[in-house]
């Protein structure tokens, strides 16, 4: 008898932190019309002629800085999370796929359909946005139109409780001037076209403030990981860090709820590049709240969510 299947999907990673593999990965990622809305006739010459040749080697350096002996941290943590969820759901078939790179969504679903009667897909993006979740939906529906998709979970009480506990534990371990809640940014144009991402991140921030034993005046919200010249959601994290340092707030705690697993953005952009900006402008300590990664609590949350909605 066939089982039910659960597919956990994250963004993806190059196969190796080498320039050719990073170039292939970036080409796939930056060719997605949900990510880059510019007409392909204008965008592709720019991508192939300027961006990939100049950005690939630089990004490869950043990937090498955070690569582990087991591989890409994003892939490793997602694999471990799958194993833990599988242990909690032995009656299900639990797999993982990546939006870009490997394992591909289409290949994984094709394999799952051989042993699964129904497939539920959970993109590991708490907040819905066209540039991440919609691409997963498109690829899943191409592979299995009948698959059920849980397209967001940032408003789930258990998720907010879990995230707040993670933040509070980190806050209580140190002495900080500010808590910065930093979400992955998206172009402002996407929000103007109806993307719900900003509303969802602002709602999550409000819910976290209610749950945290931290004075609201010590909490700020920001957006990070801006790409390209177009305006993205503000305030930018890097500018916020610079301002906090100049105000004499020398010790900050940063949490990045958009990233459920440690990846290039948390390990390199935040802990290295943003930390350097903060220190160079008078800051002292920048500490990251650990991502949920493969924690037993996060695995249990996913299990409960899927059994309730899957």
Swiss-Prot record:
EC number: 4.99.1.9
Compartments (UniProt record): Cytoplasm
Keywords: Cytoplasm, Heme biosynthesis, Iron, Lyase, Metal-binding, Porphyrin biosynthesis
Annotated binding of Fe(2+), by residue: 184, 265
GO biological process: heme biosynthetic process
Catalytic activity: Fe-coproporphyrin III + 2 H(+) = coproporphyrin III + Fe(2+)
Pathway: Porphyrin-containing compound metabolism; protoheme biosynthesis
GO molecular function: ferrochelatase activity; metal ion binding
Highest taxon listed in the record's lineage: Bacteria
Top-tier EC class: lyase
Pfam families named among the record's database cross-references: Ferrochelatase
InterPro entries assigned to the protein according to its UniProt record, in alphabetical order: Ferrochelatase (IPR001015), Ferrochelatase_AS (IPR019772), Ferrochelatase_C (IPR033644), Ferrochelatase_N (IPR033659)
Gene Ontology CC, one term: cytoplasm
Family per record: Belongs to the ferrochelatase family.
Function, as annotated: Involved in coproporphyrin-dependent heme b biosynthesis. Catalyzes the insertion of ferrous iron into coproporphyrin III to form Fe-coproporphyrin III.
Descriptive protein name: Coproporphyrin III ferrochelatase
């Amino acid at each position: 008898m066939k089982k039910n299947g659960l597919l956990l999907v994250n963004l993806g990673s190059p196969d190796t932190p080498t320039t050719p593999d990073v170039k292939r990965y970036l080409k796939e990622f930056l060719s997605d019309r949900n990510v880059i809305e510019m007409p392909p006739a204008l965008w592709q010459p720019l991508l192939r002629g300027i961006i990939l040749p100049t950005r690939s080697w630089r990004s490869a350096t950043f990937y090498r800085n955070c690569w582990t002996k087991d591989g890409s941290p994003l892939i490793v943590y997602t694999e471990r999370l799958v194993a833990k969820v599988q242990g909690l759901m032995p009656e299900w078939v639990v797999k993982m796929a990546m939006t870009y790179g490997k394992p591909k969504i289409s290949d994984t679903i094709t394999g799952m359909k051989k042993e699964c009667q129904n497939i539920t897909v959970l993109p590991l993006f708490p907040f819905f946005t066209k540039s991440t979740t919609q691409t997963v939906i498109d690829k899943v529906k191409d592979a299995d139109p009948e698959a059920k998709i849980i397209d967001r979970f940032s408003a789930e009480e258990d998720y907010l409780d879990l995230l707040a506990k993670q933040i509070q534990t980190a806050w209580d371990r140190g002495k900080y001037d500010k808590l910065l809640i930093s979400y992955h940014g998206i172009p402002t144009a996407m929000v103007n076209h109806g993307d719900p991402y900003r509303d969802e991140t602002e709602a999550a921030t409000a819910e976290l403030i209610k749950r945290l034993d931290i004075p609201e005046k010590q909490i700020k919200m920001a957006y990070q990981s801006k790409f390209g010249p177009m305006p993205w959601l503000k305030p930018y994290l890097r500018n916020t860090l610079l301002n906090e340092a100049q105000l004499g707030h020398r010790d900050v705690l940063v949490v990045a709820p958009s990233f459920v697993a440690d990846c290039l953005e948390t390990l390199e952009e935040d802990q290295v590049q943003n930390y350097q900006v903060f220190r160079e402008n008078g800051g002292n300590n920048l500490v990251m709240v650990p991502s949920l990664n493969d924690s037993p609590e996060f695995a249990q949350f996913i299990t409960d969510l899927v059994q309730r909605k899957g």
